[in-house]
Amino acid sequence: VREHFPEGLSAESLSRAPIIEFDRHDMFQQRFIGRITRVRIDPPRHFIPSSAEFAAAIELGMGWGMLPEAQSAEGIAAGRLAELTPSRSLKLPLYWQRWNLHSPVLDALSQIVEEEGKAALEA
């Protein structure tokens, strides 16, 4: 934050600061930029297609990116991560995908994953 956003967030600072993205389909950071600036910008980017390594790249200062609260809370508390907009957040829909098979075991597992995921994310 000190290096890339010393004057705060703006279209200019966001256009220069490197983004960490999961892959070429990851539009979460672009969605955040759009909400902040209302313009389309194309900053430099690094693709890190691993959840743990994605977070590590942000902690190492390779760039900025959006992390779930559960994944970022410890780093924020320890001072290794900083919130760019502490009073604002973005919600991202999550999907549980499975084979389209009739299976009581998969049906039960899907229900458990949905219930536990919802409880964990709304806590």
Identify what each model region corresponds to.
Residues 1-3, 17, 92-96:
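Small-molecule pocket liners
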Residues 21, 47, 83-85, 98:
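Structural signal for conserved beta-strand scaffold positions within catalytic alpha/beta enzyme cores
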Residues 1-10, 27, 101-107:
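Short helix-loop capping/hinge motifs at secondary-structure junctions, enriched
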Residues 39-83:
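Hydrophobic hinge/microswitch elements
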Residues 10-12, 36-38, 73, 86:
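Short secondary-structure boundary/capping segments
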Residues 16-38:
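Secondary-structure junction motif
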Residues 86-123:
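A late-sequence structural motif
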